[in-house]
Amino acid sequence: MKQLLDFLPLVIFFAVYKFFDIYIASGALIAATALQLVISYLLYKKLEKMHLITFVMVTVFGSLTLILHDDSFIKWKVTIVYALFAIALGVSQIMNKPLLKSMLGKELIVEDKIWARVTWYWVSFFVVCGLVNIYVAFSLSQETWVNFKVFGLTALTLINTVLTVVYLFKNMSEEDRKELK
């Protein structure tokens, strides 16, 4: 249920874009992200930091898109969010408080050097995705960018997540692997 809720704003953005335009879709994205927060709070009695950050970013960049009638703001939002993720992960690793380890380290027990590799891998991933987003957003058609944002970046993130879990699992001790099964 939680994962479906995470995709709600993206699905609504895409559907509204296909029937209307980028501006109505941007407004729908703001509303859907707010709805996501409300549903998340009602179901889980708490709000995740990532959802709050996403809501603020969507609201700011979506509103600028609507007010100035300029789709470049909603396009930049993707790159800025990825840049923030990369910075947060990189800084947390440099300060020896890796975010990924703090989120997953209780279930997936591996050496700190493995967490460092995974963290820098994700930093690189977010930087590359942010740069590719800039290229697609400003060099190709708006429709191509929307499809890339919805399907391309989502697929890349899911593939990256699977690869990360496989890598972490491979680097776990045999005993810890058995405990997960």
Curated annotation (Swiss-Prot):
Q: What does this protein do?
A: Plays a role in cell envelope biogenesis, maintenance of cell envelope integrity and membrane homeostasis.
Kindly provide the name given to this protein in its UniProt entry. Answer: Inner membrane-spanning protein YciB
NCBIfam families in alphabetical order: ispZ (TIGR00997), PRK00259.1-2 (NF001324), PRK00259.1-3 (NF001325)
Q: Which family does it belong to?
A: Belongs to the YciB family.
Q: Which GO terms describe its cellular component?
A: plasma membrane
Q: Does the keyword Translocase apply?
A: no
Tell me the compartments it is located in. Cell inner membrane
Name of a matching Pfam family = IspA
Major place of residence:
membrane
Q: Which UniProt keywords apply?
A: Cell inner membrane, Cell membrane, Membrane, Transmembrane, Transmembrane helix
User: In what way does this protein cross or attach to the membrane?
Assistant: Multi-pass membrane protein
The family database entries (InterPro entries) matched by this protein are listed as: YciB (IPR006008)
* Membrane-traversing stretches: 10-30, 50-70, 72-92, 118-138, 148-168
